[in-house]
Amino acid sequence: GMLKQDDTPTAGSKIVGVVNRDPYATPRIIHDTFVHAISHAQKQILIINPYFTLCRHIKRALKKAVKRGVDVQVMVSQKSDIPITPRVVEYNAHRLMKAGANIYFFTGGFHHSKIMMVDSLYSFVGSANLNSRSLSFDYECNLLVADRYTTQQLQEIFVHDRDTRCFKLTPEVWKHWGRWKKTKCWIF
């Protein structure tokens, strides 16, 4: 297919940075960029990530963001292409929900997007997952898009999917998942 020309109101004035992770040359660049963005968010963080198996630094930064009043909303896939991943995702989702984040499970299939929007100001779009393997060992490439209009468009997609194709993780949902499912979350 053909690339679509940017005909948005901010065409030609967007600031886009490439954050390229090479395990040998720039091993921590994406990890540090994510932690910095989360740690400095003031109002809202919206995340879509299928492998929400969180390294401890990202987990800690998200919990601190919630504590300082940032609206943290995370969308994860209910289904996965890796068998063990759903248990770990559910465990991390539950822990963040208990800390005050809003967690949504996407029911429209496997949502493979990796997007983070911060304070309606900028967004990250790319290949990096928020897990230790992706942030420590894999070759990854993300774009940092410093543009309110683009971020707003991504937020609208997030809100549409959240409101039409997701269910929210609540204490009641967690309670009804049953003992065996929760035990598997804890083990893995």
Task: Report residues per predicted region.
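Charged, low-complexity intrinsically disordered terminal segments
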Residues: G1-F188
